[in-house]
A protein has these predicted regions:
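Glycine-rich, low-complexity segments
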Residues: 2-66, 121-160
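Hydrophobic residues positioned within well-ordered beta-strands of beta-sheet architectures
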Residues: 25, 84-86, 100, 115, ...
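Histidine (H) residue identity feature
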Residues: 47, 73-77, 119
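Short coil-to-beta transition motif at edge beta-strands of beta-rich domains
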Residues: 69-90
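Subunit-assembly interface segments of extracellular/virion macromolecular structures
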Residues: 92-95
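Short beta-strand-centered aromatic/proline hotspots
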Residues: 97-106
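Short, solvent-exposed secondary-structure boundary/capping segments
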Residues: 106-120
């Protein structure tokens, strides 16, 4: 639960809310699996069985109307084979969620983006209209192995 204290001319008002948000981008889970815009602030998959999903769709704006298009479209920018991990968690006291890794290209449609993913884990059940938070962790670029010299001295017990 969330508690807010507000100072007003009449005194202090306490507001207790049982609605809590999940961390990250505030969106709504959509159960429709079609490759078409489902409306503002929605995130959805291309398969009803999330462990079989290979594409996540993100509307170009999150729940408050802020544009996330450039951010989502950058998920395939790192050069690592798995460029990011996406955590989608339902808001509330007993949340459900799903974890995917970005494994391929991001394609920008006119009002939403398509992200190629591989399923990692699911806990609980996300249902249509659930308020969810979307958290993304980038993996970074692959490092270059240049000027690497193998030194076996410590393993062989030799003293230089």
């Amino acid at each position: 639960d969330r508690v807010e204290l507000r100072l007003t001319a009449a005194g202090i008002t306490a507001i207790i809310s049982t609605i809590s948000s999940a961390p990250g981008l505030q969106m709504a889970w959509e159960s429709n699996i079609n490759d078409a815009d489902q409306g503002a602030g929605k995130v959805w998959a291309n398969h009803a069985t999330l462990s079989s999903a290979t594409v996540l769709y993100f509307d170009d704006v999150e729940g408050s109307g802020a544009s996330i298009n450039a951010f989502i479209d950058s998920l395939d920018d790192p050069s690592a084979p798995t460029s990011a991990t996406i955590y989608i968690q339902e808001a509330g006291s007993s949340p459900a969620g799903v974890v995917f890794q970005v494994t391929g290209a991001v394609t920008s449609a006119s009002t939403y983006s398509k992200v190629t993913v591989a399923h990692i884990a699911t806990y609980g059940t996300l249902t249509d209209g659930d308020s969810v938070g979307v958290t993304i962790a980038f993996s970074g670029n692959n490092g270059a192995l240049v000027n690497v010299v193998e030194d076996t001295t410590p393993q062989l017990g030799l003293i230089p």
